[in-house]
């Protein structure tokens, strides 16, 4: 059995204001250029239009800023610390959608990080230490989505992620390992009233996210 816990996080007032300003700048540019995001092709069009002018580049920068803020806001990091303390006697894997967020978490909480930049030898050493219980918590940016056996993990924390159903079912698979009296937990941290809200809705529509 496993438990899914959706955690909605309110941004701090100053970060909320900064997010809204940046997001509105990006959306205004998209509207002025008649770009409606319905398919991946629309995003490609947005990127092409952004590259043609200073205003476009500023709009893209604003989008990146807002997205990064939602992924690793102060409020989200505080919430993450609370969860880590709650499960301090259990092994946990933290999932992020990008390397920058993974490294921010690693530096903030002094946790080992595995990304595609991590050397193979270092990755193997960390995973071995994790399996042997010498490392209690690990942060990864997509690298562990598939093909890695970590049988003792009972806690997963999705700090940020894409809307890919396949990706998140794989994340469930990383923690849902059979064991006596074991109940796995998957936390999903979502910055409320940001682009993360819509991403969360998409991925949780999958049957794997409906089970309790």
PLM features: residue spans?
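Interdomain helical connector at the RecA1-RecA2 junction of SF1/SF2 helicase-like NTPases
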Residues: 1-87
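Active-site-adjacent beta-strand anchor residues
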Residues: 12, 73, 94-96, 158
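Conserved helicase ATPase core of P-loop NTP-dependent helicases/translocases
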Residues: 91-96, 100-148, 166-169
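Amphipathic alpha-helical transducer elements in NTP-driven molecular machines
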Residues: 13-16, 20, 77, 124, ...
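Conserved segment of the helicase C-terminal RecA-like domain
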Residues: 174-207
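Short beta-strand/turn micro-motifs composed of small residues
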Residues: 96, 115, 160, 188-190
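Conserved SF2 helicase motif VI
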Residues: 127, 155, 163-185
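Switch/connector loops and helix/strand junctions flanking conserved nucleotide-binding motifs
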Residues: 17-18, 148-150, 164-169, 180, ...
């Amino acid at each position: 059995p496993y438990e899914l816990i959706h955690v909605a996080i309110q941004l701090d007032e100053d970060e909320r204001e900064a997010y809204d300003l940046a997001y509105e700048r990006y959306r205004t540019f998209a509207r002025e250029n008649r770009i409606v995001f319905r398919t991946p092709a629309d995003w490609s069009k947005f990127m092409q239009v952004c590259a043609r002018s200073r205003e476009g580049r500023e709009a893209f920068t604003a989008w990146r800023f807002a997205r990064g803020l939602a992924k690793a806001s102060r409020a989200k990091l505080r919430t993450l610390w609370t969860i880590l303390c709650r499960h301090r006697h259990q092994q946990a894997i933290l999932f992020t959608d990008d390397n920058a967020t993974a490294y921010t978490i690693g530096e903030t909480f002094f946790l080992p990080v595995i990304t595609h930049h991590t050397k193979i030898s270092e990755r193997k050493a960390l995973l071995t230490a994790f399996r042997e219980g010498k490392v209690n918590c690990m942060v990864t940016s997509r690298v562990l989505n598939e093909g890695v056996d970590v049988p003792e993990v009972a806690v997963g924390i999705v700090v940020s992620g894409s809307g890919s159903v396949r990706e998140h079912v794989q994340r469930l698979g990383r923690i849902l390992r059979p064991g006596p009296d074991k109940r796995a937990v998957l936390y999903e941290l979502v910055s409320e009233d940001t682009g993360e809200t819509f991403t969360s809705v998409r991925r949780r529509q999958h049957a794997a996210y409906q089970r309790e």
